[in-house]
Amino acid sequence: MKQTTQLETGAEGTPDVRAGDKPAAGFARRSRPSRQAAYEPDEALSSYAAPPLQPWEEDAPRSAQPPAAPSSTLMPKAAKRMVILAIVWLVFLLFVSLKPAHAAPEAGATGETANGARASYQLHCAACHGTDRLGGIGPALLPENLSRLRKGEALKVVRDGRPATQMAGFGQALAADQLAALVDWIYTPVVPAPVWREADIRASRIQHTEPAKLPARPVFEADPLNLFLVVEAGDHHVSVLDGDRLEVIHRFPSRHALHGGPKFADGGRYVFFASRDGWVTKYDLWNLKVVAEVRAGINTRNLAASPDGRHIAIANYLPHTLVLLDGDLNLLKVLEVSDRDGKHSSRVSAVYDATPRHAFIAALKDVPEVWEISYDPAADEIPAGLIHDHAQREGAFIPGYLNPRRTQLNDPLDDFFFTQDYAELMGASREGKGQVVNLDARKKIADLPLAGMPHLGSGITWDWRGRRVMASTNLQAAEVTVIDLQSREVVRRIPTRGPGFFLRSHENSRYAFVDSMMSPEYKHVLQVIDKETLKVVHELTEQPGRTLAHVEFTRDGSYALASLWEDDGALLVFDAQTLTEVKRIPMRKPVGKYNVWNKIMREEGTSH
């Protein structure tokens, strides 16, 4: 199996822009100088085809004259019986050997199914996906890594392969029941659970390019701060889009199943990606080259980067670790994640950079704690255990640099949102419990009146009637919740078509765009909210059954780019004032797009 992918399909269709209320006059737009180059991929993936099945060899020609029968005087009756038995046995063995390799297993052979699937895997899949299923040139095939891929889609990929990839189909080599058994097997946990140690991380590092040998200036004419990186999950590529001309200037292959949140650093020159298989990639956006890669885990949630790009944090589900790297992707430290007493291990839900605090903030999935890991070498020491006197330093302390400060809570957090000063975070759990945590006092200070499953990590802020408000989608309820950040009261619940995932705006726009991608009936609809009236004023629609989601604005807020999340998808470019479509750029399932300026400046209308 070469490079199994998350396969999504959608029907073809044409856009249908449905008018709502008349759009209001827009805000003043910022102006900036506008500054494309053709590209060639750095390295094309070689095509792969499974070796053809070898026909059985025909029997060798036999002599026309049969051999003379042995003399009875030389062969006793017992010997004759043994010869006959031997001939019968040879005929049986010949029959078994000629039985097709894909024959269905005998009835009652269910106990051998796993062994058969394991044998099929080692024969057809291990060369690319690893003998231990941890991945190689193909992705890891573990339940954690396949959680976003339905078994039916996985079966289709294994049977038919994936066009334009190294993943060949095995429908001719394996029978239907063998294919089903193989897919079932890769969705079963590995026992004992796989590990990924410090030595594995160090050994996996690949240096592709020496940064010192590259020019310290962009090799293209576009504004480097108005570039978009577009993650195309359809064929595992990333496109670099000029935000002024709205044209692709470069496209390069990525690791399998990138997480949708690349992180920019060093003024936007470098960007760091994380794949679901744990691969971290450093990319030089000015020179359009991959610099280095390292595998930091087996199943990874996301990564965070300090603004100068000198420290990188990777949140893992498998193993239960938080991995810290330097800017060249060399290992600094692996933090084994567990509660304070070391009794309960935990996955890491997410990690984000808190720039004013010179620290990473991580939420734990299985333990009710939030960690703050300072990347300031001069950080204050952290008390360890009982401290009799802080002033006199009576007690045990550990270095504050790259060690966790723990905030213990009553409930774990799956998602969170920083206030503007990064002194507090607003978090939510899968059970719909919201809370406010003060990172300086390291304790919960308030509850949030949230229901359903709010997606606070996608929250945005703006000023409304003299108050600073935050708005968030909800993964279970058809609404956008608007909260006063001072009083922490809900000021409005805005009804939407269905549960949504992404909410986006820009400080130069009076509009916020929200999807309903969690709704099967309305995932093709984008709704536009007026940030002054807190009402839906417009709808943008695609053909039902397709998914329209994830908006990102250009640097000055002039245009809003939305993703048509299909393998034959596109970026839809809308005028941010008139809300009319001005351009459509074909893409292979563009799951996300990220503007350099908006990310490095922590623009209020986007997540960070």
Regions found by a protein language model. Give the residues of each.
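Extracytoplasmic electron-transfer domains, predominantly the class I c-type cytochrome c fold
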Residues: 127, 132-137, 141-191
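Surface-exposed loop and turn segments in beta-propeller and other repeat-based domains
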Residues: 335-343, 377-378, 382-409, 448-453, ...
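Repeated scaffold domains used in trafficking and secretory/extracellular systems
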Residues: 217, 258-263, 300-304, 344-352, ...
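Short loop/turn segments that connect beta-strands within beta-propeller blades
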Residues: 243-245, 285-288, 326-330, 375-377, ...
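Loop/turn-rich, solvent-exposed surfaces of beta-rich toroidal or solenoidal domains
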Residues: 501-569
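Residue-level detector of Asp-centered blade-edge/turn motifs that repeat once per structural unit
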Residues: 223-224, 266-267, 307-308, 355-356, ...
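Flexible coil segments in periplasmic/lumen-exposed cytochrome c-class electron-transfer proteins
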Residues: 107-115, 122, 168-234
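A short beta-strand motif characteristic of beta-propeller blades
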Residues: 247-252, 289-294, 331-341, 400-407, ...
